[in-house]
């Protein structure tokens, strides 16, 4: 009985650790008030997907310009087609778009992309959608 409990605890630990390792890493590179657009700011970030990482369904309430730096990613907006992007390719999300698929295209290799957001000053970068 004790052996089964130990195995269960180890498996739970491994599964939890694996799930936690699958989260995207977001790094803010620059934020700038846009004086010609009162109340707006530009935010430049990088997003790194570990191998197999996926995003929750969300929106940005912003204009989001995506540029793939490394690896490949899969993106899809509600009502749109799923697209696979490789280094040098771009993607756009509008303020009203719901992002239903965002993930690394390769379960064994990470991916990295640059995102320029034009958004309301102080607004959240990502808003979960149910």
Predicted regions and their residues:
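N-terminal targeting signals for Sec/Tat export/insertion, comprising classic cleavable signal peptides
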Residues: 30-63
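Ligand-binding loop in jelly-roll beta-barrel domains
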Residues: 82, 97-122
């Amino acid at each position: 009985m004790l052996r089964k409990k130990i195995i269960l605890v180890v498996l739970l630990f491994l599964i939890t650790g694996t799930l936690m390792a699958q989260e995207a890493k977001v790094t803010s590179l620059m934020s700038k008030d846009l004086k010609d657009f009162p109340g707006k700011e530009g935010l430049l970030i990088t997003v790194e997907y570990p191998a197999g990482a996926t995003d929750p369904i969300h929106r940005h309430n912003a204009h989001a310009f995506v540029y793939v730096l490394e690896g490949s990613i899969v993106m899809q907006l509600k009502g749109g087609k799923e697209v696979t992007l490789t280094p040098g390719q771009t993607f756009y999300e509008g303020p009203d778009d719901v992002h239903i698929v965002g993930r690394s295209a390769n379960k064994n290799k990470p991916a990295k992309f640059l995102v320029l957001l034009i958004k309301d000053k102080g607004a959240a970068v990502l808003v979960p959608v149910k």
